């Protein structure tokens, strides 16, 4: 692994263990076994390194979504993708929180944009099957916001896992909201 990749991996480790608030170049340098000038040579600043680490986290997240085998049934595949999203946040709550903060700060992250496109693709497959009850973009907003809400439960209280019934209910209500009952027509 080259020095730049080593620093990004070390930064991810620090964010996962300490959160963005606990991020320090000293901790990253200790893990990567480099000096501060090496870090600044590659990234210019602590924020430059943190941005690179968050970009890598989004790339890892997108890779996990693309690598997972999904059902041929588009509604089942949507549920599986939703579960994958929430599982990532549950397993890596501090990193997920840092990722969301970067997006809220207006960062343009290609893997985040690609992740949204993947969600829209999955919902378009539901529309192609004739089971979408609303516009594809509106449905994507609803599904993403429900997955984000469930994920936030893991971030806000990492020591106390949310009740699985709450998480499942969030998913099912969102999916039911965007899907037309079988045999019905999409509203005009």
Protein language model regions, located:
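Short alpha-helical functional segments enriched in proximate histidine and acidic residues
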Residues: 14, 64, 88, 122
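Alpha-helical DNA-contacting segments of helix-turn-helix folds
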Residues: 15, 49-57, 99, 108, ...
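Helix-turn-helix
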Residues: 3-6, 10, 14-48, 52
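Hydrophobic alpha-helical connector segments
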Residues: 66-94, 139, 143
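Hydrophobic/aromatic-rich alpha-helical bundle segments in the mid-to-C-terminal region
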Residues: 101, 108-109, 113-116, 126-176, ...
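Hydrophobic, amphipathic alpha-helical faces that serve as interaction scaffolds
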Residues: 95-98, 104
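Hydrophobic recognition helices of helix-based DNA-binding modules
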Residues: 53, 57, 61, 65, ...
């Amino acid at each position: 692994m080259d020095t730049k990749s080593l620093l990004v991996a070390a930064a991810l480790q620090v964010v996962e263990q300490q959160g963005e608030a606990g991020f320090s170049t000293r901790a990253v340098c200790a893990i990567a076994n480099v000096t501060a000038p090496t870090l600044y040579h590659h990234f210019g600043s602590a924020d430059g390194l943190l941005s690179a680490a968050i970009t890598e986290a989004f790339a890892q997240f997108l890779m996990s979504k693309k690598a997972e085998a999904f059902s041929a049934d588009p509604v089942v595949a949507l549920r599986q993708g939703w579960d994958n999203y929430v599982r990532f946040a549950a397993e890596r709550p501090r990193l997920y929180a840092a990722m969301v903060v970067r997006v809220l700060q207006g960062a343009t992250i290609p893997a985040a944009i690609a992740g949204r496109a993947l969600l829209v693709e999955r919902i378009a497959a539901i529309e192609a099957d004739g089971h979408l009850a609303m516009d594809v973009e509106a449905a994507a907003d609803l599904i993403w916001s429900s997955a984000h809400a469930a994920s936030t439960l893991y971030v806000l209280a990492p020591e106390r896992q949310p009740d699985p019934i709450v998480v499942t209910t969030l998913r099912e209500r969102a999916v039911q909201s965007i899907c037309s009952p079988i045999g019905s027509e999409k509203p005009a």
